[in-house]
Amino acid sequence: MALAADDILAIQKLIADYNHAVDVGDGPAFAALFVDGGSLDSGFNVIKGYDELRDFAGMVPSMAPGARHVVSNLSIDGDGDDATSRLYLQMWATAGGAAETKLVITGRYEDTLKRDGGEWRFVTRKMIPDG
């Protein structure tokens, strides 16, 4: 059975919550978006488990001041309590001041998702940089 519209909307919200949490460095909120033992492959390293995910998100504002994750072309498929999503990413950040916003990276995400305790969460999120 295909996903219900409410499930698709909940997954869209999960993805938006991810972007907002990582951009402001809210490590606890970011890590809570993943199942226990969930992982993020950033394209450069793999971050796994609540503590590593929390610490990673907490560092983003200092590594990429003014970071803004902008995603598009979201495609969600699934059945029951399992789903996948694919989407494109642009990450913008400031360099030397707010007036100098630049495109830092482009790529795509490939996600595996699971309904966990009634909420959709990431099992794995893989970022595949362009080029």
Labelled PLM ranges:
Residues 91-95, 113:
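Beta-strand elements of well-folded, non-transmembrane domains
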Residues 13, 71, 108:
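Short, conserved clusters of charged catalytic residues that mark active-site
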Residues 27-91:
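A solvent-exposed, acidic/Ser-Thr-rich amphipathic alpha-helical stretch
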Residues 1-28, 32-36:
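Short, low-complexity N-terminal intrinsically disordered segments enriched in polar/charged residues
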Residues 84, 106-131:
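Short beta-strand edge/turn micro-motifs at domain boundaries
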